[in-house]
Amino acid sequence: MEIINGPVLPRYAAPATGALTSDAKISGQLLRRVHLRRRACGLQGDHYRAARRFFGFPSERHARSGWVWPVCCSYGSSSDGDGAAAADYDASGEEFVNSSVMEAVELRSVSDGFVIKMRDGKNLRCVQNNPRVLRLRDSAPHHAIVLKMEDGSDLLLPIIVMETPSIMLLAALRNIRIPRPTIYNVVKEMTERMGYAVRLVRITEMVHDAYYSRLYLAKIGNEEETISLDLKPSDAINIAFRCKVPIQVNRRIAYNNGLKVVQPTPSESYVSSDQFQCTRLDRPDDQPCFEAQEFDLVRNMLVAAVEERYKDAAQYRDQLFMFRAKKKNMI
């Protein structure tokens, strides 16, 4: 693996001064026309304020409750917003590495690193690949989507997400049939009906502890005509997995924020005479198995959420919280 030293330096696309001047002139002309028409028709001030929010300058359009556009789109072959050509999205492919999705459930911080809990109940102990980067100051578990780098480094990139995208991705990984279509299935079908196909998803940069990703679409029959969308990584990864397209990660992000899996400590494992690595085995006894009870609650909650039985899922969630609190008090 080629190691890139130094901090992550995200690139920002500085808008041209001429574009800002042109935008200001157009906004001012539209605003003056609306103002004159308001006076001629006798409209009230609320209509004028609404027009200012729509046709005014960016500071006026987005001043209300910090509202911003949820999706940014670049069309054509000029630029995708970060300096790379939108149509030729493989031009800077050397900056990215392919990755695969792991069946991870949650991520939590411990004293000596991190622990990734997998769907099958296994825990992966990890340490930061770059010790200078500090993340996850609290020890509470977080829902996470984990990407594994496919360049031979085996680095893991955890992305903290909300509960619903994590459950939807696990359902897709396990081929669990959901009775009603999800938003990701709707986006996939809508894209195909518009004559486009999803080609690629990239995790491009990290700004203020938030990952940025882009979804690349290409016109079917004309690969030169592309659309680049700015999406949340959780949504972009869900769409990419369902469309079976590559998921790429910026190499600097993988190096600076990736985790390395460490071997279990000697107290947790031993090597038998036949040289097989054996871990501690669960042995039946007369005591209740808390791990099995916790696993049953988690499984029932996930199944209920996937089947859209949200009331049952909420009940299982409350039972799980009470069970974990009781277990913590017993320790």
Curated annotation (Swiss-Prot):
Primary enzyme class: hydrolase
Disulphides: none
GO cellular component, one term: nucleus
Family matches, as Pfam families: BFN_dom
Entry keywords, A to Z: Hydrolase, Nuclease, Nucleus
Residue intervals of the UVR domain: 291-326
Transmembrane segments: none
Domain BFN: 126-261
Cellular localization per UniProt: Nucleus
Main localization of the protein described in the UniProt heading: nucleus
E.C. number(s) listed in UniProt: 3.1.-.-
Superkingdom: Eukaryota
GO MF terms held by the record: nuclease activity
BP GO annotations: protein ubiquitination
Annotated function: Bifunctional nuclease with both RNase and DNase activities. Involved in basal defense response. Participates in abscisic acid-derived callose deposition following infection by a necrotrophic pathogen.
Entry's family note: Belongs to the bifunctional nuclease family.
Name used for this protein in its record: Bifunctional nuclease 1
Lineage: Eukaryota, Viridiplantae, Streptophyta, Embryophyta, Tracheophyta
Gene that encodes the chain: BBD1
